[in-house]
């Protein structure tokens, strides 16, 4: 009888602990917008390294390094620089073939892209440290995007950004 009472008490204590943990657990989605005109950091609760933003009218478009991951060059849209949504990927399925590098790659491929809007077209330029400077373009941020084009074959280049001169040349 005493043994059964001890087992019942232990079972009650152990079960109460599990129930307390279950009732306290709340899974929340991160929201930076406080709903009162303020926000809390981080605005983007994810790894969007080397972000670049361009403004077209009242809209903001962001892209960031995607390295060797696919879909690559995700495009995010915002009206207020706080609330962002993914609207497309400029490199959805494949990157250009890689020539064998002289040494191992460490997260290369798409580094520090630059997104710009010029003469009704969106352009994204990025550097691949082993191959050179690539570019994709689209008339709409939602896509479809062109296939990546190797603009300049060169090693060791990252953090590219286009500038258009008065003649319209990049």
Spell out what each predicted region is:
Residues 1-6:
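Bacterial N-terminal signal peptides that target proteins for export
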Residues 7-16:
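Bacterial N-terminal signal peptides
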Residues 20-170:
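Carbohydrate-active catalytic/glycan-binding domains of CAZyme proteins
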